[in-house]
């Protein structure tokens, strides 16, 4: 009897495994089309674009065919712009504070083909987006909002989950000098402020953005009026600090800044290069003319920042 039970158990196991194997011969999910563009905590997908001398760069955005089996046919996916989704995000996150909204990138700064081909036997294709970053003012938060459009002939189905069919690309150009600098060694103070003049103003981090291949800007929240542009003069250690609004904010340099760059291989992971960029001898003044209507508040900053 024990032998009979063993035989029956073996037959049941074989049938179960056979059934499982048969299941995987057929598609378990729809072959939906989606972007590979995971969002961050701000609701957008940050893409870092290396700044070239020409200002032009290419970003390859993956387009996926979901499912448990291989795609067995050629698919032509149509891509379009979706300003409505960007507006919905802005209203949900910032309400009526339009000064905080993400801005749709002007069409002169990008181009991409209307369709992407995904070949039979492949589950991924790429949308090649050509960006021209020349003259792009990073005072605004630029986003390229994309969507997978419905197939005119019904040959594919877009993934209707919001963050799969849509891609809100937050464009972040970078160069060798842009990034987050430590600001603890850059001290500011109020000028002509009486008892409060000697109180130090310190910011632990200073985020800089690329303007071109060798220029960055460091800004406060109201950065349209108070941008500071740092140009690293080629083949020297000179850093030229300027403002494009000095006639209003009274920006003035007291000492010419200089740069120091140190590179060394990591002691533990020798395949990593550690690069430190320092901007030294920073000494400038400016006047805040928007914080308090009718008043001008003068600041002076001195020290070093490093990344």
Task: Enumerate the predicted regions with their spans.
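C-terminal motif of bacterial Sec signal peptides marking the signal peptidase cleavage site
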Residues: 15-19
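Intrinsically disordered, low-complexity regulatory regions in eukaryotic proteins
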Residues: 21-117, 126-143, 149-307
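Bacterial N-terminal signal peptides that target proteins for export
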Residues: 1-8
């Amino acid at each position: 009897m024990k032998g009979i039970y063993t035989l029956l158990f073996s037959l049941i196991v074989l049938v179960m495994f056979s059934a499982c194997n048969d299941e995987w011969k057929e598609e378990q999910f729809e072959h939906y089309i989606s972007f590979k563009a995971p969002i961050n905590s701000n609701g957008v997908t940050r893409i870092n674009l290396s700044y070239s001398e020409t200002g032009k760069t290419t970003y390859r955005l993956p387009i996926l065919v979901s499912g448990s089996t291989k795609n067995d046919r050629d698919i032509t996916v149509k891509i379009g712009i979706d300003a409505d989704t960007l507006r919905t995000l802005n209203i949900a996150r910032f309400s009526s504070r339009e000064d905080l909204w993400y801005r749709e990138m002007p069409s002169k700064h990008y181009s991409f083909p209307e369709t992407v081909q995904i070949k039979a036997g492949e589950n991924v294709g790429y949308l090649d987006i050509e960006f021209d970053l020349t003259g792009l003012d990073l005072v605004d938060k630029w986003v390229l909002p994309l969507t997978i459009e419905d197939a005119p002939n019904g040959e594919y189905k877009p993934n209707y989950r919001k963050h799969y069919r849509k891609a809100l690309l937050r464009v972040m150009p970078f160069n060798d000098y842009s990034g987050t600098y430590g600001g603890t060694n850059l001290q500011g103070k109020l000028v002509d402020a009486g008892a409060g003049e000697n109180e130090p103003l310190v910011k632990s981090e200073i985020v800089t953005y690329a303007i071109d291949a060798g220029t960055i800007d460091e800004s406060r929240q109201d950065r349209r009026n108070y941008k500071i542009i740092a140009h690293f003069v080629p083949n020297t250690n000179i850093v030229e600090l300027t403002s494009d609004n000095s006639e209003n904010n009274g920006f003035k340099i007291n000492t010419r800044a200089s740069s120091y760059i140190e590179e060394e291989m990591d002691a533990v992971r020798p395949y990593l290069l550690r690069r430190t960029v320092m901007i030294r001898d920073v000494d400038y003044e400016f006047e805040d003319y928007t914080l308090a209507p009718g008043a001008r508040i003068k600041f002076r900053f001195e020290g070093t920042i490093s990344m």
